[in-house]
């Protein structure tokens, strides 16, 4: 049989996976979940097997972006492989696996992953890389593919935001920057503010994430929005697990039974203050009660400063080229106004004679890396950068790290 190609974008919140010839990946939570009745669910099983998400507890294999628990991850991967191949059998012995992992992953954790790939599952060939390095490939075939030699990727996910320069299809590691603010930090801040101002929702992770996704946005001008905050007021109807299991935003056309026990949240400045943490990290300092968080114990710059630092740390001749091809990906970039705000701030900070272009991919922002990985498998270069199972057992586990690990050039 001919070789198959399987791509996994192994995010700390969602997994995107599938054969490279699929039209789109399957996407589900990278977690085990436990309901109040004690039942354990894998991935998105809880969405179809229960209609009460209240008090759901999630156990994720990632901590601060690092894959630390293969005991959890293997159960999720088994679920993924079963979901991804209902019509096409996954035979690892003839399958090439493209897998993403966080930049600057600890070498021992990467070696654990390599061991699972080759020794547990027995994949035939393997390529491991940072998610951002696949993003330029996702634009191949588009009218802008000619610009892919110099790309700066802003990947804002669940555990943090990475700014990664890609030069001639290689990560320029000296320029990589990280802002430790991502979806998890936004959810935590939203949880504490709502619990203080309205209802205690500390044990409602599904509800918190739903409120963020349906109501929050990035303000173009934070000070102006704050001064006119009342016009951004919206009412979020909380789930009663009879008429709605997730809750929804009330509109003029929303029919609501006013005689029932309807509970709602009136959200005003929370809608844009939470995402503003990307530009004013002090918002988190002022509103969080955690004393163990990385964010609490470390000072860091905002996203604009880090993008500028990233560009300036790259070779001088590439700097204006990178500023003209900035791509935003990751779940947080689904926030309305995220890309426009970043463009607005960078124009003020970068040289006036540079062209500044910040754009989104043609795909769903949190699926861009998967589509890039699928496109990469169609290029002959995949044969030069992959490691076979034979190479792994012949040279040992360090061989993968030499090939795939980050380079301090």
UniProtKB/Swiss-Prot annotation:
Q: Where in the cell is it found?
A: Cytoplasm; Cytoplasm, Cytoskeleton; Nucleus
Instruction: Tell me yes or no: is Amino-acid biosynthesis among this UniProt entry's keywords.
Output: no
GO BP terms, alphabetized: chromatin remodeling
Cellular component terms, GO, for this chain's entry?
A: cytoplasm; cytoskeleton; Swr1 complex
Q: Does DNA damage appear among the keywords?
A: no
Q: Tell me, in one coarse class, where this protein mainly resides.
A: cytoplasm
Keywords attached to this Swiss-Prot or TrEMBL record, sorted alphabetically, are: Activator, Chromatin regulator, Cytoplasm, Cytoskeleton, Nucleus, Transcription, Transcription regulation
CDD domains in alphabetical order? ASKHA_NBD_Arp6
Function recorded in the entry: Component of the SWR1 complex which mediates the ATP-dependent exchange of histone H2A for the H2A variant HZT1 leading to transcriptional regulation of selected genes by chromatin remodeling. Involved in chromosome stability.
**Quaternary data:** Component of the SWR1 chromatin remodeling complex.
Q: Which family does it belong to?
A: Belongs to the actin family. ARP6 subfamily.
Q: Would you tell me the protein name for this molecule?
A: Actin-like protein ARP6
Q: Which organism is it from?
A: Debaryomyces hansenii (strain ATCC 36239 / CBS 767 / BCRC 21394 / JCM 1990 / NBRC 0083 / IGC 2968)
Its taxonomic path starts at: Eukaryota, Fungi, Dikarya, Ascomycota, Saccharomycotina
